Structures are given as C-alpha cells and as structure tokens.
C-alpha cells in the first residue's frame, strides 16, 4: 500500500501548476467562462460558432460554423442573467444568440442573432458534460445548440437546435478568444 503525503514542496508545485493553467487561459470544468470573450467550438467538428458574413448587425442573421481564427465574429461574450442562465452575444455584432421564431420546440430550427432583450429565447443554460465540453440549451425551447448534420467539417454549415442527447455534435468547448 502506498501512502501519499502532502509535503510543502508538493503543495507549492501543485499551486504553481494550477496558477500556470489559469494564466494560460485554461477553462475550469463545470463553469463556463464569463466576463471575457470566448470561442464556442463544436466538439464534433472542431469549428467555431460565428454569424453568417461576420459583420451584419441585422436581426435574423444565421449562426453557423467556420474555421477558428482571429476574426472577431468568432468571439462571443457569455453574460450571466440569473439562476444559471446566460445570454450569449456575438463580439462583432453585439447581437444575442437565439432560435428562429423563439418558440418552436421542433428539431432543426436555425440558430441566429437577434437584439439582446429579456425574451427567454435569447437565454441559454450551459451544462458541463465532462471532459471540458458543455451542452448549450435554449431556455425557451429546451433544445441543444448543434451543427446541421452533426458531422461536416465544412465552413458555413448552419447551427440549429436539436434534442439534447449524448451526440458529441451537441457539445461545445469554450475557450478564451485568441487561444
């Protein structure tokens, strides 16, 4: 039987390691990154969530996946509202992620951007599923954010809502922008 002791040197080394992870921008599992710009990376496709064209501030512009690069439209802000609920707004356009029409619980309804307001369709639950990935589910519809078809690594594939299940395309990595 091996007994591990907590020595002062070991505790210092552990603290330095954890501080290094924090300084490097590692995300603690269980809590989404808030109060900074992040990239939402689909766990299945490895592509970043963005807004079609990347610049329009119009409402109802489709959210889709694209290569993760330095374009500001690939960055999002996750802002806590209350009770574990968040608004997710695009850093380039300032618009909030929502579901088309805001009420349908059908699968395959497009995700898009819209004015940030108090409508529950503009709010999301972000739930850790383990391994550094999260399900992002719409508060109004109860459906999870995913990518159409769930497998394509092509750019410009539409983001939409679908039943929350164990398919990896329904999960997202949340990383500080620029990393």
What is the role of each PLM region?
Residues 1-34:
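N-terminal prepro-regions of secreted/extracellular proteins
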Residues 30-179:
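Lectin-like carbohydrate-binding module/patch detector with strong preference for beta-trefoil
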